[in-house]
UniProtKB/Swiss-Prot annotation:
Protein name (Swiss-Prot/TrEMBL): Valine--tRNA ligase
Motif 'HIGH' region location, chain numbering: 40-50
Record organism: Legionella pneumophila (strain Lens)
Database matches in SUPFAM superfamilies: Anticodon-binding domain of a subclass of class I aminoacyl-tRNA synthetases (SSF47323), Nucleotidylyl transferase (SSF52374), tRNA-binding arm (SSF46589), ValRS/IleRS/LeuRS editing domain (SSF50677)
Subunit note: Monomer.
Purpose of the protein: Catalyzes the attachment of valine to tRNA(Val). As ValRS can inadvertently accommodate and process structurally similar amino acids such as threonine, to avoid such errors, it has a 'posttransfer' editing activity that hydrolyzes mischarged Thr-tRNA(Val) in a tRNA-dependent manner.
Gene: valS
Coiled-coil portions: 849-921
Entry similarity comment: Belongs to the class-I aminoacyl-tRNA synthetase family. ValS type 1 subfamily.
Amino acid sequence: MDKTYSPEAIEKALYKKWESHHYFQPRGEGKRFCIMLPPPNVTGSLHMGHGFQHTIMDALTRYHRMLGDKTLWQPGTDHAGISTQLVVERQLEAQGVSRKELTREQFLDKVWQWKEESGNTITQQMRRLGASVDWSRERFTMDEGLSAAVQKVFVQLYEEGLIYRGTRLVNWDPKLGTAVSDLEVLSEEEDGFLWHIRYPVVDSEEFLIVATTRPETLLGDCAVAVHPDDSRFRHLIGKQVHLPLCDRTIPVIADDYVDKEFGSGCVKITPAHDFNDHEVGKRHQLPQINILTKKGTINKNAPLKYQGMDRFLAREQIIKDLEQEGLLAKTEPHKLKVPRGEKSNVIIEPLLTDQWYVKTKPLAEPAIAAVKKGDIRFIPETWDKTYFQWMDNIEDWCISRQLWWGHRIPAWYDNHGNIYVGYSENDVRFKHKIDQSTPLKQDEDVLDTWFSSALWPFSTLGWPERTPELEQFYPTSVLVTGFDIIFFWVARMIMMGLKFTGKIPFKEVFITGLIRDSEGHKMSKSKGNVLDPLDIVDGIELDSLIAKRTSNLMLNSVRDRITKATRKEFPEGISAYGTDALRFTYCSLASTGRNVRFDLGRVEGYRNFCNKLWNAARYVLLNTDEEQIDFGDGAFQYSPADQWILSRLQNTVSKVHHYFETYRFDLLANTLYEFVWHEYCDWYLELSKPILQDDQALSAMKRGTRRTLIHVLDQILKLLHPLMPFITEEIWQKTTKFTSENGISIMLSTYPKVNEEFINPSIEEELDWLKSAIQSLRTIRSEMSISPAKLIPLYIRNITPELKERIAKYEKILKTLSKIDKINYLAPDEKVPVSATAVLGEIELLIPMADLIDKEAELSRLNKELAKLNKDIELAQGKLNNPKFTDKAPEEIIAKEKDKLAQAQLAKDKLLQHKNRIESL
């Protein structure tokens, strides 16, 4: 083995070998296990959330594969309607070509061309993270087979009356010219204004003051609402008010929707341009006056003066006109949530349009029942409340999008506006007996991307055909996804799965938290805190990282802020940590919380863990050979240390299985880390040395220790493999010659099982006592600054016959690992020189201090340390007592300063205790 572990030297070659040998394909006849990869956008590149979830899915896949289950991790990508269309449009614009200059067919040819050339970035990146998906089964949501499934579902739902065309309010993106889903609308707080407008009461001197953040929508107002219990306005309910700037009157209505305490207590109701107002309008049978075109300009339903104006220019003009007519009472600054299109960044308009809808209530009822009955289980279970909350209040699903890229809606229209739905124009003509002389035109719209995604678990397995894969792997075992798409994707898969297969799509749903930065902030391009998983794997220089984080940013101020923050956080850029360290970090963070704070310091810690494992393997391989181990019938004897580590191994194996079954990857990672680092490396490898280095030791005992070293290493590699596939495969390939298992890959070997024969509580208790004794003696050395190499005498007081026997049994180990030259037992009243003492149960361990340390030199060193700490404490206290600092500094900076002070005070207390001990010598 090389002296140091270099991930870059092994990872790509190992993955290539795994993939080319088809190790990822289902094999055997064991229990079926199947995971569906949530299909990433074909335009996308791997982000931290992908890396996190893919690691968890891969860990589960590798675990079940090693259990002997017939395992399938089904990969594929999503056509990502809007995202892909925008990417290709921008590419064409760079060449001076507008989409509108092309026919639909020409544009779609360009999209398919782009998909073939550039659409596989994310799948290549998945390979770098070790994803063991069955690439031979890779699917795409626009594949021929998946498109056939989409058509069948649409046609069947339409024929059953569950798909219809209707006029409703949708999120409209004026820049993209399409309806968008709630998930594609980002609402963040922005600075705006609240305009207070006077609405004069008809035939009265009174007026109502209405506060609004969107005065341009006043043109579509259909009522002013007040709370029914608001005594200020009760006398006006049912009266009419003049609509400012418009030649019409509107009623005053009473509705519980109004918040009496907000603004003036009066609310303008615009049913065609606000989702809440739309509901109020339905309750009061108000008209719906749409005042906007699909491009976001004022239409012909508004007064002539404003027609054709952009909505925001109209806003400015309306404010001026209101002022001129004395109808603007006041304007005040106001913070508000502004809905913007995720892709376009323009303000989204609620707009009345004709769209296609799925009637969801009949589909939702069995989907709710499936979770209530426990057929589908959410992990953590608290997420089922979110699921029920959404499903109980479900509204019809708008499934049409005004795009060219996507599954085109299989509906045709004749010249009279009649709608015909079928698999093709010929199918429609045949079914409805329409001859060729009647022209038919296909609907221009495409289906919402989530429509095809909702069929993913069964369409990828060959549905509507009854394929062997569908029979074997559906329902799938578990879905791993984020809480943000429980409704948009998870719920819809459950509804569609039950409707079209009669079965649930998956048995369990493991909901992960969302990856945030180390301060707990959401990762976003505008914040400049985004990390690319592959930059952590391969490393990146500072200048390249800054260039990556600031590309395509319009504002210089934002670019400068991000540059400054990046230089501060990563002055040397990011080191190359390798895939395994990153994957182990992801698993260690997979707790049950909503948010996951990602800290690069943890990756560094787990890179050290990789090094520790590598060095442990080198030690084992340097101290073993085939003859010395002899897994055949050669005589061997296990030492107490061997028995201890074998017993501890069974405990670890048991916990690991439990944590895999309960999806506690954080506890799983911690259990393996503790066992490998602390029990195997720190203790067992040290405990093996006195035996292997003792010329007097029995050859059978040495053989037993070597056998244990290699066996436990083999089990560790297998236990770790689902989390850290590369380093474990590389080391395992070097150990197979020493074991009876000469497999071709660790991923196809058998996952460790508990061996009851090795469980030995009494030996664990003895070794725990021995470790405590050694640790106590090492602590004395450290606290008293005694050289680790210096042999020292040990005195023991209050010894019992049982403990004396135990010490005799472990004397060689105790002396070797504690650097003790002689053990002396004291009579009850026997005096010893001034000593450092450790208490271990009933006994006292004493180390005489005479001649072991230079008292004056040590006191001088301690005084210097204390002076430095006093200075640090004074500095921190000064800051924290200064109102200029505590009032203005961010909370996290103040918290860091408090932590710094607490650490310094703790260190000072320890040094003072040590100084007192030295002075007493």
